[in-house]
UniProtKB/Swiss-Prot annotation:
Family: Belongs to the alpha/beta interferon family. IFN-alphaII subfamily.
Keyword Cell cycle in record: no
Organism of this sequence: Cervus elaphus (Red deer)
Protein name: Interferon tau
Main location: secreted
Length: 195
């Protein structure tokens, strides 16, 4: 599961960074894969949102942190990786298999896995030994807590259809934030603090 999220993260990062700026070679295919994953997730809707209004919840997506330019390059890469990994983990459970169309779900899992694989190469080149420290603190820990809240919500709602629909909408927000962070990395040549 972690491998797939790593792949998704790699694809996203590749699509939003100029060649060589992050010390890795991610193709334009990575960007397209990120868009395809977002589209697949949108197609997974099974219930009208109006039927699930009572189940809505603010999960506290760390959107400002992800999109607001607060992250250094190595932190941004670690956050991208963690978000993709957690998305992959969420959709790679037995309970998610029962909730979604299996064909769409498998395509999403495959796309996330590919992005994580691509990002793993970049993560290793850019962060090296620092990665384990970055994953245990700061922004990456914030991402882990965000996804832990989603898992707790699903458990509390007993993995109901509406709970999964609410989570699906939230994951669309998360993947959109990932895309914006990738674009920012690409525009800034990997330097998130550039004007």
């Amino acid at each position: 599961m972690a491998f797939v999220l790593s792949l998704l993260m790699a694809l996203v990062l590749a699509s939003y960074s100029p060649g060589g700026s992050l010390g890795c070679d991610l193709s334009q295919n990575h960007v397209l894969l990120g868009r395809q994953n977002l589209k697949l997730l949108g197609q997974m809707t099974r219930l009208s949102p109006r039927f699930c209004l009572q189940d809505r919840k603010d999960f506290g997506l760390p959107q400002e942190m992800v999109e607001g330019g607060q992250l250094q390059k190595d932190q941004a890469i670690s956050v991208l990786h963690e978000m993709l990994q957690q998305c992959f983990n969420l959709f790679h459970t037995e309970r998610s298999s029962a909730a979604w169309d299996t064909t769409l779900l498998e395509q999403l899992r495959t796309g996330l896995h590919q992005q994580l694989d691509d990002l793993d190469a970049c993560l290793g080149q850019v962060m090296g030994k620092e990665d384990s420290d970055l994953r245990r603190m700061g922004p990456t820990l914030t991402v882990k807590k965000y996804f832990q809240g989603i898992h707790v919500y699903l458990q509390e709602k007993e993995y109901s259809d509406c709970a999964w629909e609410i989570v699906q909408v939230e994951m669309m927000r998360a993947l959109s934030s990932i895309s914006r962070l990738q674009k920012r990395l690409r525009k800034m040549g990997g330097d998130l603090n550039s004007p």
